[in-house]
Amino acid sequence: LFHGHVLNLKNKVDYLFIPRFTSISKREYVCPKFGGLPDMIRHSLNGLPDIIDTEINLRKSNKNAIKAAMEIGYRFTGDTSAIKRAFNMAKESYYKSRQLLKKGKLPDDFKTREKRKPGNNEIDGKILNIAVIGHVYNIYDSYINMELIDKLKNNGVNVITVDMIDEDIINEKTSMLPKRLFWNFGRKAMGSALHMLDRKDIDGIIYLMSFGCGIDSFICDLAERKIRRESDIPFIVLTIDEHSG
């Protein structure tokens, strides 16, 4: 799927931005496959434009974010002030998008004001709230998940994703676990699942799992066991092929 995205873009752009993600938060790691994406693409496809593969590693300090931004910016200009301004504008836009997500908006809602058609989202007068837990690239890529989110929304279901849950709540929930989760996604997924146990408005949970994903294999199992033992919330696991959809 990632190869497909690149093939679609390669003749339309001057650069491909494929950052080498190592860590996006202190003391945590991103899945190693993200660190290998630039090399995978560079050595498997021909005729590519220049690839910007700056490492993003915030494991020790968030200050490394500005270092990465400066490294990228110097490819285009020597104006340090201009790069810093662009970095601050990007941060502001990012924080605004995070706030929209926490208010229950989905990424597709950012680019359109068109209202979805109302569906039959009530059972005995109660609105259905369904939590969808999984990697964001699975949740928000309609090709991979076969338009799962659209199908839910078009039927009037209120969809709740990991991004809509406050980071402090996630950290509080995962702090109760016997061992710290050092994968960024694992912490968020598990914390979100545990948070659902406290909510009285959740009617069901869908765990969108990648076939062959090591993190998913144990986080999903832990979450499912916990929820089935301590609640009567319906829990379903949808396993998809992240390579082909």
Q: What kind of feature is each model-predicted range?
A:
Residues 1-245:
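An N-terminal assembly and electron-transfer interface module characteristic of large anaerobic redox
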